[in-house]
Swiss-Prot record:
The Ig-like V-type 1/D1 domain contains three complementarity determining region-like loops CDR1-3, which mediate interaction with IgA and IgM. Disulfide bonds join C40-C110, C56-C64, C152-C220, C257-C324, C271-C279, C370-C440, C384-C394, C481-C543, C485-C519, C495-C502. GO terms for cellular component: plasma membrane; secretory IgA immunoglobulin complex. Residues 654-757 are cytoplasmic. Residues 607-627, 679-730 are annotated as: Disordered. CDD domains: IgV_pIgR_like. Residues 19-126, 145-237, 250-341, 353-457, 461-560 form the Ig-like V-type domain. One of its GO terms (biological process) is signal transduction. The chain crosses the membrane at residues 633-653. In the absence of dimeric IgA, Ser-727 is phosphorylated which allows PIGR to function normally. This is Polymeric immunoglobulin receptor. One of its GO terms (molecular function) is transmembrane signaling receptor activity. Keywords: Cell membrane, Disulfide bond, Glycoprotein, Immunoglobulin domain, Membrane, Phosphoprotein, Repeat, Secreted, Signal, Transmembrane, Transmembrane helix.
Amino acid sequence: MSRLFLACLLAIFPVVSMKSPIFGPEEVTSVEGRSVSIKCYYPPTSVNRHTRKYWCRQGAQGRCTTLISSEGYVSDDYVGRANLTNFPESGTFVVDISHLTHKDSGRYKCGLGISSRGLNFDVSLEVSQDPAQASHAHVYTVDLGRTVTINCPFTRANSEKRKSLCKKTIQDCFQVVDSTGYVSNSYKDRAHISILGTNTLVFSVVINRVKLSDAGMYVCQAGDDAKADKINIDLQVLEPEPELVYGDLRSSVTFDCSLGPEVANVPKFLCQKKNGGACNVVINTLGKKAQDFQGRIVSVPKDNGVFSVHITSLRKEDAGRYVCGAQPEGEPQDGWPVQAWQLFVNEETAIPASPSVVKGVRGGSVTVSCPYNPKDANSAKYWCHWEEAQNGRCPRLVESRGLIKEQYEGRLALLTEPGNGTYTVILNQLTDQDTGFYWCVTDGDTRWISTVELKVVQGEPSLKVPKNVTAWLGEPLKLSCHFPCKFYSFEKYWCKWSNRGCSALPTQNDGPSQAFVSCDQNSQVVSLNLDTVTKEDEGWYWCGVKEGPRYGETAAVYVAVESRVKGSQGAKQVKAAPAGAAIQSRAGEIQNKALLDPSFFAKESVKDAAGGPGAPADPGRPTGYSGSSKALVSTLVPLALVLVAGVVAIGVVRARHRKNVDRISIRSYRTDISMSDFENSRDFEGRDNMGASPEAQETSLGGKDEFATTTEDTVESKEPKKAKRSSKEEADEAFTTFLLQAKNLASAATQNGPTEA
C-alpha cells in the first residue's frame, strides 16, 4: 500500500524531487513581423547530448504540445518559419522563430526527453504590435544609458522661429528643451538643441544618458502659431536583454562588461539583483567588494574600457540577475549605460566537493586538494594567493613547472598525480601572514577554478623535527622525524624539496618515539640516512604522512653541509633530534665538555666561526669577519682556561669532604666520587639519550644530569687493588696534573695561533 501511495505522489509531483538543470530565458519580447532566437542550456553529459530536445507550448490545462523537436518533427504552424539546432559541445540548443504574430504570445517550455517530465524550463514569449504602425509617429529606440538624436524637419517659413521639444502627458505637453536655451530640470545637463545652419531645414535634439523614464511620446516643433511645423516622436528605451550564463555548482564564471569607449575612464561596477529588489554592488573599480564574495572574486580592466569580473566557487545563492555599468561613484544609477546577465547555477555538477576552509597551527602545515578537469591533465596548474587590492588580484606562488615566489622556498610544493583529476598543494612552516584566500587554477578549463580559505590557529605541530642541522662533508647523516600515535597507520616518508616538488627518499623505521609519552606504543621515529654527505645533499628535507593518495601533515628541516675545521675531532654520526630534545642535549654536552676537555672552548669558537649548525650563512657577510674571529678566539682561550681552573678548584674543595670513595675512570681524568652521591645503582650505567647522539652517556652527579658526547667507544676496566690513599692526596695530585696540562695547552695556543687551538 505504501509503495502505491509513493507512486501516486511521484505522478502528481514529478518536478518536486529535484530542481531541473535545464535553463533558458524567463521572458522574451518582440514585435510583429520580426524574429526571436531562444537559447536553452543543459548539462553536457553524454546522455544529454544525444537525448531528444523539444520546444512546446503550454495549454490551459497544463499540457505542453510539442511544436518542434531535434528529431525532425515540426508542427504545421511552424513549417517554414522555425527550426531547432543542437550544440552538444557547449550543452545548448537554439530555437529560432521568424515572422512573429500576436498569436505567438504565450507560455512555452524548452526541454529534454519527454515533455511530461521535469527536464524543462518555462519561457514566456510576448509579441506586441509595431509601435510605428500603431501611433503613426516616428519611432526612436535607444538602449538604457545611451544617447539618442531626434531629427526634426521644418519648412523655410519657420526657419527663424523658436524650435522646441516637449513631452506629452495626459493633459498637456511640457517643455523639455528649446532654442532659447531653456532646459527642463529633468533633462538638465542631458539635453540640447543643435541647428547645423540656416540652409539646413532640420534641427536635432540630443538626449544623453537616457533613462527609463524618458520613454514616451514627444512633439518636435518649429514655430508657435497655427502654421508651426510639428512631428510626433515615439521614444522607446530598451533595457538590456540579459545574456544567459550557465554555471555548475563550485565552478567559476566570467562576466565581460563592454560598455563602449565613451565610458572607458568612468568607474565600473557589477551588482546582483534578487527577487526584483535593489541591485547590490558585488565589486567595483573603486575597491568595494561584497562580503559574500570575499576571497573569490577579481576584476580585470582590459582595453577599450572592457571590465571583466571572475567569480569562483559558485554557490546556489549566487544565481540571479547581474548588471554591470559605468558611473562616477561606482554605484547603480539610472541614466548610465549597463549590461545584464542571468546566471543559473546547476546543482548537478561534475566538480567534486572539497573543503572551503583549511586550518593549520603556527609552525605546522596544511594540505590542499585542487580539482581540475581530467581532460586538462597536461595543462599547467598553479596556486595563487588572493589579495585585497582595489580590483582584487591573485599573484601566482607556485605552479607545476616550478616555484615562482622565492620567499616560499622550502615551504611550498605542488604535487601532481596524473589521472585522478586532482593536484595537491602543501604549505608548511605556517605563520600568521599565511592567513587568507588561495585559488587553485589551471591553464585549461577556467570553470574548474576553486577557492580555499586558510586559517592559522593556536597549537603545536604534530611532527617533531629539528629546524636546522649541520652535516659534515664525507660523513654520515641521520635525520629523525617523530610521529604521534594518531599517525600510526599512516604511510610515513622523507623527501628532498626542490622548486619542482619533493622527491621521495628511502627511510627506516626506528621504532617507538620518546617524544610522545602519552602513547609510546603507537608513536614512531622514522629516519633518513645518508651514508656519505656531499655538497649536493644541502637543502630542505620534508618528513610527512600519507593516507592512500592523500597527503597529510609535513615538517621541514634545513641541512647545511660544511667541511670540518682542521684539528677538530670527528663525530662518528650526526643524529638529528626533535627541537626540544636537541636543546637539552646541547646544554648537557657543553657542560660536560667544559669539565672533561679544556680545549672545548677553543673548539666551539672555531665551530661558531665556521658557521655552526643552523641555516645557511649570510652571503652578505663582510670579508673581515674571519680575522675578527681569530682575534676573538685568541682572547677567549686564556679566559676559558681560567674559568676551567676555577671550576676544578671548587671540585677539589668538595672532594675533601667525601669519604668512602670508589673510583670511576672518565677518559684520562680521574675523579673521586662518593657512592652516597648516587641515587641508585642504575646511575653507574650509560643510557642512550634519545634527544642526543648515540654516544651520549648520562650520569647523575649530585642530583644534576649532565651529558658527555664521546668521539670514541669508552672501555671500562678494573684497576688492580692498590694501597688506600686519602681523599686529600688524590685530589691534590689530580689538581697538579691538570694545571700542568692547562699550562702546556696555553703555550701551544700562543705559538700556533687561534686557528690551531
